[in-house]
């Protein structure tokens, strides 16, 4: 099985506690990009992941195969739709 290149849509509490640790410890996934609008909190724990500043920047990356939409609930539909339309 090939490794799936993953982008994480946010690095708030759920990204830090649940999503990034799961992705980074699962041998089938590679955490490649993380959206952090202003900070760079993920850099210490995930130095190989690239920090991007927007969701739009994340979905435009052709290398990203899967996007974890862990943003506030009110944005889930729109971000999931955009990710699916981008083939993620």
Question: What label would you give each PLM region?
Answer:
Residues 49-88:
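Beta-loop-alpha module in the N-terminal Rossmann-like domain of NAD(P)-dependent dehydrogenases
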Residues 1-46:
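N-terminal Rossmann-like dinucleotide-binding module
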């Amino acid at each position: 099985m090939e490794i799936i290149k993953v982008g994480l849509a946010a690095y708030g509490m759920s990204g830090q506690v649940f999503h990034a640790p799961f992705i980074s410890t699962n041998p089938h996934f590679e955490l490649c990009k993380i959206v952090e609008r202003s900070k760079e909190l993920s850099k210490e724990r995930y130095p190989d992941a690239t920090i991007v500043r927007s969701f739009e920047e994340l979905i435009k990356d052709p290398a990203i195969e899967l996007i974890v939409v862990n943003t506030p609930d009110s944005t889930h539909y729109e971000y999931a739709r955009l990710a699916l339309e981008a083939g993620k």
